[in-house]
């Protein structure tokens, strides 16, 4: 029979192993919800006004997920062996 300490150790190991996967899935879901804001970000949008769906999605999005996605986007050029570029945005 498995001791209580062994069971606790197994549960902790399972949590640690699945933590990044769960966080990645959570971020993926939250970031996909922010797609309702895409029309506000497209070139040519004249005086875009945020709608309630965009604002609600943005408010519900984990800020770390959003910031990490933006940081990751800036590395895409190097991952694709393309020249880097600067959009004039500082974070």
From Swiss-Prot:
Keywords: Disulfide bond, Secreted, Signal. Disulfide bonds join 27-65, 37-54, 55-80, 67-87. The keyword Disulfide bond applies. It is found in: Secreted. SUPFAM superfamilies: Bifunctional inhibitor/lipid-transfer protein/seed storage 2S albumin. The keyword Metal-binding does not apply. It comes from the Eukaryota. GO terms for cellular component: exine; extracellular region; trans-Golgi network. InterPro entries: Bifun_inhib/LTP/seed_sf, Bifunc_inhib/LTP/seed_store. Tapetum of anthers. Residues 1-24 form the signal peptide. Belongs to the A9/FIL1 family. PANTHER family: BIFUNCTIONAL INHIBITOR_LIPID-TRANSFER PROTEIN_SEED STORAGE 2S ALBUMIN SUPERFAMILY PROTEIN-RELATED, PROTEIN YY1. This is Tapetum-specific protein A9. It comes from Arabidopsis thaliana.
């Amino acid at each position: 029979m498995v001791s209580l300490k062994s069971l606790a150790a197994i549960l902790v190991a399972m949590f640690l192993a699945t933590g990044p996967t769960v966080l990645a899935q959570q971020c993926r879901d939250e970031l996909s919800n922010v797609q309702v804001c895409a029309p506000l970000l497209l070139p040519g949008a004249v005086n875009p006004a945020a709608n309630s769906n965009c604002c609600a999605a943005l408010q519900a999005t984990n800020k770390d997920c959003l910031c990490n996605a933006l940081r990751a986007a800036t590395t895409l050029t190097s991952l694709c062996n393309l020249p880097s570029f600067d959009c004039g945005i500082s974070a």
